[in-house]
Amino acid sequence: MQPPSLPERYLDRRHWLGLATASATVGLINQPWIFAGQQAADSKQLIVHGETPMNAEPALNKLVQSWETPVKHFYVRSHAPVPKVDLDSFRITVEGMVQRKLSLSIAEITDRFPATEITATMTCAGNRRSEHSRVKKVGGVQWKAGPIGNARWGGVRLADILQLAGLKEGAKHVWFESIDQVKKDGRTFPFGASISVKKSLEKTRFGNGTLLATTMNGRPLPPDHGYPIRTVVPGYVGARSVKWLGRIVVSDRPSANHYVANAYKLVTNGDQDEWAAAQPIYKFPINS
């Protein structure tokens, strides 16, 4: 099981557009529920911790069978049910501290920006939480060691979209907001995340940095993994890669979204003051 020699490769535009065209031809683009039968079959190969919303992980003997994790063995982490999407009206907005506010359809994103593909690992920030709970009980999904996977993500660079929008002086953070609807503590709100502008713009020898991804392992994103578009932030925990992306906001401060301000932090006692003072988890901690 050898990894590919190059961590990233650019896609031929005809191939890229071919994916979208083929999907539209069979009705997948506007009807994500077409995936439902396949996803139901795939879920039987996962250890399901919750069905609404879906949270599931593969058995480790399945996970290690290939370098590129098949969708059927890729963990699913959701805080809300899969939202319904109509591509005819769907738009991603880019706003905040930008020179030009943008409103882009999926077709405009794939037509106007260079397509790229990167192999990147995704892992849940709560990976192996069940092991921690053996020592001290921790709330949340009691994950084993399976919520981690390695996939080929295809899409466009976030940096290219931000370049078109133009960053204003003082811009330091980029927020991502989903179109899902999380119900928690009597409130309804979208899942969200934010990363630094520096992380958003980076391009290293390991790859092209943060992506707005529309494909996974060479095929359109399945609904459980963010159809029609999501962010992929290599090197960061999965909580910073937002599925079902609908809004990007450039700001001078981190997002105030619950999952940045009040969750996915490392705390000891867990009282409100400690939660408020703790910094959000970003980089994936190496463990064995």
Where are these regions (language model features)?
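N-terminal secretory signal peptides
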Residues: 1-11, 15, 22, 26
